[in-house]
Structure formats: structure tokens, C-alpha cells
């Protein structure tokens, strides 16, 4: 009985951890809208809120690691679950890093890139939501989890295309003296940080894929 109680507890913490990562991203969406408007005060406040949520996600992850160490789940399943949790946690890490980069630079957002950034944020949001649904489906519907893995791959490819478009545009704007060197470098770094969110989400989905493959035998 105690063994199953451990599994129930770690599954509960897994859901909580996933929700915290989702909350980090939702706050980051708010932050980017504030960034477009030039609201540095709100960007700073939201960065702090994201840092708190990322810390809370870390605390939940540590609890889960202790529960795994104490024997939750069978050994053949335990390692894959630990790796999945760590991969999901890295998504929160890169969200916090992107938020900090935006907040630190205090760069005035160049309006000509607003539509492309919103497009990248939209597809990044789809990637994060698909990851959330993928992980939830691991316990209920492996076929649906697999479909979400493929969705994440497509979304990450879309994010890469938009990232390249933005960076190409930034180089063009810099060469034509529409933006200065400091803004160019800051915006390029921010672009890469935002794109990195989808990259880490795809990494987490790769861990989910391993679990799916093993369970299907």
C-alpha cells in the first residue's frame, strides 16, 4: 500500500510541476506584451513573478526527486520519469532566462518587428500547451501523447522559421541604420532566448517519446 501511496504523491506533484511551468509561460506572454508597449515597470514586475514561479517549480521538482529516491515507481520506469521532469523543468528555466534578458536590456521595442514577435510567441504558446497535453496523456492515452509529440515537432520547426526571419530582419535594419548596434544585439539575444523555449519543449517531448516507446513495447 505504501508503494502506491508514493506513486500517487509523485503523480500529484508532477501535475503541480507541469502547472507551474505553464504559469511561467502565461506570465511571459504578459511580459512580452508589456515589452511591446515599452512598459519597463511592468516588465520588471512580471520578471520577478516568473522568477518566483520558476523557484516554486524547482521546489516541486526536488520533492519529486526525493520521492523517486524513496522508491516511487519501478526502477525501469523511474529513470525515464526523472528525466522527463528535469526536461520540463528546463522549460521554466529558459522562460525565466528570456524574461530576465528582456528586463535587463530595457531596450525600446522596434515596432516593425511586433507582428513577427507575436507570431513567434503564438507558436511558442502552442508548443507549451501541446507539451502540457502530451504529458497529461501519458497516463491515459499513449496515442494522443504521440500525436502531441508530432505537433510539438511541427510547432518547433515553425518557431525556427520565424526566428530566422526576425534575425534576418534585424541584420537588415542594422545595416540600413534603422536600429543601432546596442538595440540590434539586445534584440537578437531576446529573439534567440524566446526561440529557445520551443527548443526545450521539444527536448521534453523527446523524453516523453521514450516513455511512449517503452510502454508500447
Curated annotation (Swiss-Prot):
Q: Which family does it belong to?
A: Belongs to the UPF0111 family.
One Pfam family, short name: PhoU_div
Region forming the signal peptide? none
Name of this protein: UPF0111 protein MTH_1689
**Could you tell me which InterPro entries the record lists for this protein?**
DUF47, PhoU-like_sf, Put_Phosphate_transp_reg
Family matches, as SUPFAM superfamilies:
PhoU-like
